[in-house]
Amino acid sequence: MFVRKGDDLKAFSEKVASNLRFPVFVKPTQGGSSFGVTRVTDPSQLEEAVNYAFAEGPTVIVEQGVSGRELTCAAYMDAQGIQTLPVIEVITENEYFDYDAKYNGHSSEVCPAEIPDETSDLIK
């Protein structure tokens, strides 16, 4: 779900609460490295999390939280087409793979990820 700075946050929060299950993730649409990202477990926290994300840019998305393993796969394009690197599993000590986990040593990576080849092929 998408919101712009200046929109009615109360109405937006009500829409999120009626359409998504908690937890949700509130993220700025600009930037990276998990700046401005908040994991929200209760609807009463939404407006504060959206305002926090607005510090990084004028638009914010709210996404359904999912549980499971954190897998990632880098890809690049060369003269032969799209190339993919091995799938990596990210294991975090934190509640989710946030800035602290990424840059302050609170995560580890397993490369290649210990997953079936069929799963790896689907990710790639």
What does each of the following model-derived ranges do?
Residues 1-63, 67-69:
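Active-site nucleotide/adenylate-binding loops and adjacent lid/helix of ATP-dependent enzymes
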Residues 41-122:
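Phosphate-binding site of ATP-dependent enzymes
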Residues 13, 121-124:
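Short, amphipathic alpha-helical "lid/cap" segments that border enzyme active or binding sites
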